[in-house]
């Protein structure tokens, strides 16, 4: 699959984009063509990772929504904003679409997604209950996400397995691909590494150029097989056809693991140069905040980013970063106060639990730190070898 060079879907979509752009030039009054152009750009973003396609899709959808009061077009722009981490803007559009009432269930699915991303758990749960009546694929994948957010990974996997059965019965490649990659992720989080690998391979059988699945395999090769050189090779091959700044962060981690400080600095600088592109907006806030905190000890810059992220997205994950930055600043009691109010019992992500353990340790609460340490040892694969060393030191 690494040798897969023919980007057939990408080539076809570029031709499709060119066709509709030319049609619009010939007939500027035919604004429905904007939807076709936006769809082609969105697919090209998915295939290439190039942010310009996502931003081009946004412009077409904004123009389209000025011409219509169609709920489907509102949802399309809301979906684009979700990809850009513009969750507040997405919510505003979805509320309009809900008032419109057209294909209401499609809007309600997205309202669940956005409320969950914004940390509005009560509202998210309300929409999940509305969707429950269908018990279909779209409900099951959301019930899975909800269970995972609540720390119940076994139930999350069970919901996804049921969703996969529906996808297999429908023979819908898009649903199958979504099921395979997400099950691969969850099996990995559950330390079922062989199953995780098998499902990434199933994804590649359907789509040999799927960068997400290849990145998942690169992580297995690094974190489970302890082969950073091969993992680095996989990442280098992926980036020939798919561009995303976060590949550089993983390569920097691999370089650190291989004791190559010079190469690590180079990858981090390449990442920072990439995310300076204004088109990325708020998409990499959490990555950037952690980088400035942990690699550059630049608490002021990190704190400014974290405060922006909390304003955009007041989730437990955002407040976890605030607590972590506060600890790094030496205000150990304040860090504990923030964590107890906004993080404890609200997220079960291993990285947040690691931060919490360090906060407990700094506040002379060894029993609580030890309980989390025991839990974190189970998450060593998901967190990676470098973090596994830090966990042992708690």
Roles of regions detected by a PLM:
Residues 23, 63-64, 96-97, 128-131, ...:
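Canonical positions in the second alpha-helix
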Residues 39, 79, 113, 145-146, ...:
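Residue-level recognition of tetratricopeptide repeat
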Residues 44, 48-51, 84, 118, ...:
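Structural motif corresponding to the intra-repeat A-B loop/turn of tetratricopeptide repeats
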Residues 1-74, 92, 125, 370-374, ...:
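N-terminal leader/linker segments that initiate helical-solenoid repeat arrays
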Residues 132-136, 165, 239-245, 253-259, ...:
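TPR/TPR-like (Sel1-like) alpha-helical repeat modules
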